[in-house]
Amino acid sequence: MAGRNIKNGENNKIAGSSLHLEKNPTTPPEAEATLKKLGLVASVAAGVQFGWALQLSLLTPYVQLLGIPHTWAAYIWLCGPISGMIVQPLVGYYSDRCTSRFGRRRPFIAAGAALVAVAVGLIGFAADIGAASGDPTGNVAKPRAIAVFVVGFWILDVANNTLQGPCRALLADMAAGSQTKTRYANAFFSFFMALGNIGGYAAGSYSRLYTVFPFTKTAACDVYCANLKSCFFISITLLIVLTILALSVVKERQITIDEIQEEEDLKNRNNSSGCARLPFFGQLIGALKDLPKPMLILLLVTALNWIAWFPFLLFDTDWMGKEVYGGTVGEGKLYDQGVHAGALGLMINSVVLGVMSLSIEGLARMVGGAKRLWGIVNIILAVCLAMTVLVTKSAEHFRDSHHIMGSAVPPPPPAGVKGGALAIFAVLGIPLAITFSIPFALASIFSASSGSGQGLSLGVLNLAIVVPQMFVSVTSGPWDAMFGGGNLPAFVVGAVAATASAVLSFTLLPSPPPEAKIGGSMGGH
């Protein structure tokens, strides 16, 4: 995802590695953007995250309603990390070299938004398309709807990576080398992600949203499906409006092939291996080989951090429906009630995330630096994931007591259990704000000395996010099945990974260097 080439002709030693800083002669003075314009570009994240919030809160239960068992549901999510690993570096590479009259990043952002619209249509109407193609009715697997859903889901993840990577790259371009603006840009991005989350989870938690769009409920698409479809209508409208607004106000100047060649020549001279760069994957491999030690440690801490996060992000509402509420997919109302309670928890989480996003600068100064803050919140993450075990056992004890008293259908969990679960969601907003901001800001400072471009460098940090996601997607289903099919085993592994990430953040991750002018590529203005 995020990363930058640190340039300026000086050599700064950090943990035994030199960061080459030299001014980029092709950066126009007008590229230095105001905070207002940085915020406008960052606002696109609200549209992206609105859709992601719907994915995280509603799609795992939805695929199970289509007939995909829990063990296999995690494999559906492989498309996200796989597309992130391939698409984002690819888009970054070509956006670095784009000579469009609209600029380097804006064409990719616009294309990503258009692809999101196509994907949302396929996902929302998967059940209808499946029924029209001959899927059976009732509580059975619907293979054609599943196929349409999977295609739409893959397109959606490709679209999000096509959109989000260049959006972060444009923010880095606009920061024009200022560490302060870089930190603010990432904080703005995190803040608008929180706003998008709040909107998405609020929409997902309202069980009668389909009444606003009555045509969404059909014979093949029940109330839950119609609500999901309605949420996606709102999502794509928000994304298109924000994208058009940002791309209309913030301009990029067209660059020429000669300027690209000049930048490539400069990078080749700074390349530690002394060899010319190979296209795309060759550059990505070269970037990984030439990474300075601070960036390698950052990638390791980030990878452990995402091993901790991804099980909960993937199965949080499913955990509420099954373990906390004791429901079963497609049977009775308890599971649906739990999913909607989980969406409420995610909305509360996003409110905390938004407040924290605007407080990161002050908190980092208060605790002694960004790396120390990241270590502290990783401990908070580990404690919260461990507390899911306590909440689950309390809910099970409550249900067992009702079975003993002869109750055929247990009621929803008591207020104390539900409050404990929602408290976990709320507190997790604190470390999530840091996860969405600090790694990208540090990557901008610990930029790779591989000579890769702004967009391609984003793919380097992204690898530390998508590879753990692939690992969790492949292993969480079988791992959970070994312990009875619940979500807790993956959450416990996440708690261990968060603890390891905190230890490495405290002990190995170096502090960023003093403010230095980080050469930005030809930016927007």
UniProtKB/Swiss-Prot annotation:
One of its GO terms (cellular component) is plasma membrane. Signal peptide: none annotated. Pathway: Glycan biosynthesis; sucrose metabolism. One of its GO terms (biological process) is sucrose metabolic process. Coiled coil: none annotated. It is a multi-pass membrane protein. GO terms for molecular function: sucrose:proton symporter activity. Gene3D superfamilies: MFS general substrate transporter like domains (1.20.1250.20). The chain crosses the membrane at residues 38-58, 72-92, 107-127, 145-165, 184-204, 230-250, 295-315, 338-358, 373-393, 422-442, 455-475, 488-508. Keywords: Membrane, Sugar transport, Symport, Transmembrane, Transmembrane helix, Transport. CDD domains: MFS_SLC45_SUC (cd17313). SUPFAM superfamilies: MFS general substrate transporter. InterPro entries: MFS_trans_sf, Suc_symporter_pln. Residues 1-37, 509-525 are cytoplasmic. Belongs to the glycoside-pentoside-hexuronide (GPH) cation symporter transporter (TC 2.A.2.4) family. Responsible for the transport of sucrose into the cell, with the concomitant uptake of protons (symport system). Can also transport maltose at a lesser rate. This is Sucrose transport protein.
